[in-house]
């Protein structure tokens, strides 16, 4: 860093520290002015039923004996308790949800995780596991008086096994680091959530994360071959192995994937890798109607073409992304499809030509082929930046992920637009059109209580319609807090009964991530 830049940074530090220390008071003042019936996140006195919250709870320190034992086992530097240190862990990527934890602890080994869990279980102290905090359903949000178990320092890639096409990692390794390590040895790790630069593998496993390439390559579950998990009582369990085929007993590995930290804490992940595709081709097609884009997607799938990426942006999102990323997206259209095919060079050329032909048949205004790898990457980056681009338009951005069968996609897109008009809401919609996963993104201000109430009604209508069309309330973001009130309607009584029974057996004291998924 240049000396003058360092001096400027040093000069700013006192002001920055003062702001962090003052932040709770400023936030409390804002909330006192804007508190509403929506302020219900994990508040026993307020009841259930609202999606979002604006209340910032006061810090409630854990019992001194618990903190003392944590410091003894982990070291004082690995236990955070001051208010300014806890603020960054009081929220995740979910808009408007806030709660101060009792403390934050950093762990580096499985043994330390087991020690913390034994303590939490013995004292019946709630514990919430956290990676990078990029989740979009409130899955890693604290509850009052809880221990936040942060795994970001468990960040080692332990083994890359080229003979068996596997990689063994700790939960704090970022998704991008896994992908880069695979690429370095000529292999490929396909799952690519939008936050892959900072999201951790542990979080990906907890949420069963998807990504842009999910249509062809699947989601996180398809690439987990084994897990080391610490159970709530501190017992360490290994499930899975490097075998391609293994049908011995229940698939406990699959039980923990997508369980959102409610059944155990993942401490190691054995990942499957695949050969890197030899070639790829990226294209952008623009349409003057969203229905035409949706029909193009249906025709591509009907032609038995499975692209690795088949994404869409609506008009609002296109303009926001271009203003944000400046990659030369066309602005004179209502819908944009980002299409990418990969594999053998001859197959790639054939599929790309067929997709371009189908796009034109469905009224595409233009089909643009990326000229080189750099242009292809910039187009993919533009799509990945959709959420960030939309977030600049309003103080509060709420991203959802209702998912429907591909055959119902056009109906669902029209329904979202109708809901936005009915409730007078601003919504930008983008998502994984190839697998029916929509991301309607609400642009609002959490202080506008009347609009937040309308958004809550809009969510209910969108999720009800997704279920009616044979879809789901979440394709990749998880249930967490944001959608737990919608889960019983989607899952039904029998599934809810089985899930509650499983959770009760593994975690009878209900210490792990309480208040998430279901009560």
Q: What does each model-found stretch correspond to?
A:
Residues 235, 484-519:
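Activity-critical C-terminal alpha-helical subdomain
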Residues 56-118, 122, 135-165, 194, ...:
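N-terminal flexible segment immediately upstream of the FAD-binding catalytic core
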Residues 81-87, 271-275, 281-458, 465, ...:
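C-terminal substrate-recognition/cap domain of FAD-linked oxidoreductases
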Residues 156-311:
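FAD-binding subdomain of flavoenzyme oxidoreductases
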Residues 1-15, 33-37:
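Short alpha-helix boundary/capping segments
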Residues 75-76, 467-479, 508-512:
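Alpha-helix capping/hinge segments and adjacent helical runs
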Residues 19, 23, 41, 56-57:
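Aromatic (phenylalanine/tyrosine) cluster motif
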């Amino acid at each position: 860093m240049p000396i003058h830049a360092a001096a400027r940074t040093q000069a700013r530090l006192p002001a920055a520290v003062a702001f962090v220390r003052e932040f709770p008071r400023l936030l409390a003042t804002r909330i006192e002015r804007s508190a509403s019936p929506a302020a219900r996140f994990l508040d026993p006195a307020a009841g259930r039923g609202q999606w979002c919250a604006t209340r910032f709870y006061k810090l409630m320190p854990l019992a001194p004996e618990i903190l003392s034992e944590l410091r003894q086992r982990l070291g004082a530097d690995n236990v955070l308790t001051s208010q300014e240190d806890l603020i960054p862990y009081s929220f995740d990527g979910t808009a408007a949800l806030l709660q101060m934890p009792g403390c934050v602890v950093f762990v580096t080994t499985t043994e330390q995780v087991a020690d913390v869990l034994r303590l939490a279980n013995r004292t019946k102290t709630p514990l919430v596991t956290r990676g990078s905090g990029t989740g979009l359903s409130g899955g890693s949000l604290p509850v009052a008086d809880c221990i936040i178990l942060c795994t970001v320092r468990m960040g080692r890639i332990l083994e890359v096994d080229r003979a068996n096409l596997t990689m063994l990692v700790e939960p704090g390794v970022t998704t991008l680091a896994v992908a880069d390590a695979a690429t370095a040895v000529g292999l490929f790790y396909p799952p690519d959530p939008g936050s892959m630069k900072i999201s951790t593998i542990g979080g990906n496993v907890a949420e069963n994360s998807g990504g842009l390439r999910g249509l062809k390559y699947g989601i996180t579950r398809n690439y987990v071959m084994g897990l080391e998990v610490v159970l709530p009582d501190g017992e360490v369990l290994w499930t899975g192995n490097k075998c391609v085929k293994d049908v011995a007993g229940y698939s406990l590995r699959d039980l923990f994937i997508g369980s959102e930290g409610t059944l155990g804490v993942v401490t190691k992940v054995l990942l499957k890798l695949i050969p890197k595709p030899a070639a790829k081709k990226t294209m952008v097609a623009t349409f003057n109607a969203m229905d035409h884009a949706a029909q193009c997607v249906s025709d591509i799938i009907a032609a038995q073409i499975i692209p690795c990426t088949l994404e869409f942006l609506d008009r609002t999102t296109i303009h926001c992304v271009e203003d944000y990323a400046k990659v030369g997206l066309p602005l004179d259209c209502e819908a944009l499809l980002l299409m990418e095919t990969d594999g053998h060079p001859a197959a790639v050329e054939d599929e790309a030509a067929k997709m371009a032909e189908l796009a034109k048949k469905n009224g595409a205004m233009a089909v643009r082929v990326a000229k080189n790898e750099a242009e292809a990457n910039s187009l993919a980056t533009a799509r990945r930046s959709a959420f960030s681009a939309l977030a600049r338009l309003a103080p509060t951005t709420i991203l959802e992920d209702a998912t429907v069968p591909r055959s119902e996609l056009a109906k669902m897109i029209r329904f979202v637009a109708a809901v936005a008009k009915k409730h007078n809401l601003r919504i930008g919609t983008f998502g994984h059109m190839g697998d029916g996963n929509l991301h309607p993104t609400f642009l609002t201000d959490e202080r506008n209580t009347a609009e937040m109430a309308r958004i809550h009604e809009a969510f209910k209508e969108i999720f009800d319609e997704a279920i009616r069309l044979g879809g789901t309330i979440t394709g990749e973001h998880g249930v967490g807090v944001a959608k737990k009130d919608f889960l019983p309607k989607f899952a039904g009584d029998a599934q809810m009964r089985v899930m509650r029974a499983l959770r009760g057996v593994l975690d009878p004291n209900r210490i792990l991530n309480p208040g998430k998924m279901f009560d």
